[in-house]
């Protein structure tokens, strides 16, 4: 009968011996992994293209939500680094009539609609694929016409954000899909999805700011002082629970009318210099010659 080996048990904790061999063979993680900025497991699958699609980029819809802004970018990977095709930001929405609430779900949808129409315009596909003009909150997938070019396809890149149901990231996704972009997705993470099906009315309510309007009414009834403090910018801009939906409808129409980015105006700055400008080589030689000449004249005068 063979004897059992005296191997290490699976549940035993073994301290790492950090000797010379350990440090000699140690390989650090990628810098952005060490900083907790990039999930390389997910990034690899979002960037690697099919092997039968030669030199065809795999486009990603990169969405990042900050405290004061929502950032949406269409990007693809290259060895030199990611290339940004186009981008859209929630801080552009005041140009289309949405001056407040730039980080809520409704603003996320509008930002997605903006980048979707913008990238289609860039590739000359905006007239072929109009997307979902009448927003109803239900599922919508852009179907390619056999006689025409296929619509622009990209994949959602959420980064390290938590992909919970109703997250604003999926508002950008829905706006992009309704713009006419071919983006694979499921309705499971949209607001209003419960018990295996999507409540389109609840989702539409979020797209047009209905949930914000309901909270405004509730807070105004319960605590008017808190309402005036929390919605001071809404009150200043004349936005209330009754006209908030109309504001977003007008914004969607304005985005479809002109999604192109606003041209940057270069600022002319008058440069001020507080120290003496550096003189050129020719000026230095002339200055030395002048000093020498004055010295020689002084010597001759003394003689």
Swiss-Prot record:
Keywords: Cytoplasm, Nucleus, Ribonucleoprotein, Ribosomal protein, RNA-binding, rRNA-binding. It comes from the Eukaryota. GO terms for molecular function: 5S rRNA binding; structural constituent of ribosome. It is found in: Cytoplasm; Nucleus. Gene3D superfamilies: 3.30.420.100. Its main location: cytoplasm. Pfam families: Ribosomal_L18_c, Ribosomal_L5e. InterPro entries: Rbsml_uL18_euk (IPR005485), Ribosomal_uL18_C_euk (IPR025607). One of its GO terms (cellular component) is nucleus. Component of the large ribosomal subunit (LSU). PANTHER family: LARGE RIBOSOMAL SUBUNIT PROTEIN UL18, RIBOSOMAL PROTEIN L5-RELATED. HAMAP family: Ribosomal_uL18_A. Component of the ribosome, a large ribonucleoprotein complex responsible for the synthesis of proteins in the cell. The small ribosomal subunit (SSU) binds messenger RNAs (mRNAs) and translates the encoded message by selecting cognate aminoacyl-transfer RNA (tRNA) molecules. The large subunit (LSU) contains the ribosomal catalytic site termed the peptidyl transferase center (PTC), which catalyzes the formation of peptide bonds, thereby polymerizing the amino acids delivered by tRNAs into a polypeptide chain. Belongs to the universal ribosomal protein uL18 family. This is Large ribosomal subunit protein uL18.
